Amino acid sequence: MIGEMRTPETISTAVTAAETGHLVLSTLHTNNASQTIDRIIDSFPGDQQDQIRTQLSSSLLGIFSQRLVPRIAGGLIPAYELLLNNNAVANLIREKRTHEIDVVIETGMEQGMVDLNHSLLELVRAGEISIENAYQFSLNPKGLERLI
């Protein structure tokens, strides 16, 4: 367990450990899976980014991102996004197309992936959060509107 990956050295150590078969869990302050991948890659100098892309594409198992949303009954509840690495995700990472990962998450729900808007919608339907808070915490309010 790595508290937070803030430096290239920490990230490199984590990726190397994952490549050798160790389960590595860590935190990073980002809003979603594509931002997480971009933050990891962007922490390296330009001449090392292709290498970390390749390593990350083959060693990453998944990314769990959460946003804490105010509950109707008080307190907070997590709305989340879950990205599971597969061939499509690995290719997008290697090909510098992480901006397309949201589409893979939306189409990968049968594989167990969850996009933030579906998580928010389920919380609204369960009476846990208000629709207003769902829109406020969505990273794609127009996409949420299409689901409702």
Question: What are these language model-derived features?
Answer:
Residues 1-148:
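Short, flexible helix-loop junctions that flank or precede catalytic/ligand sites
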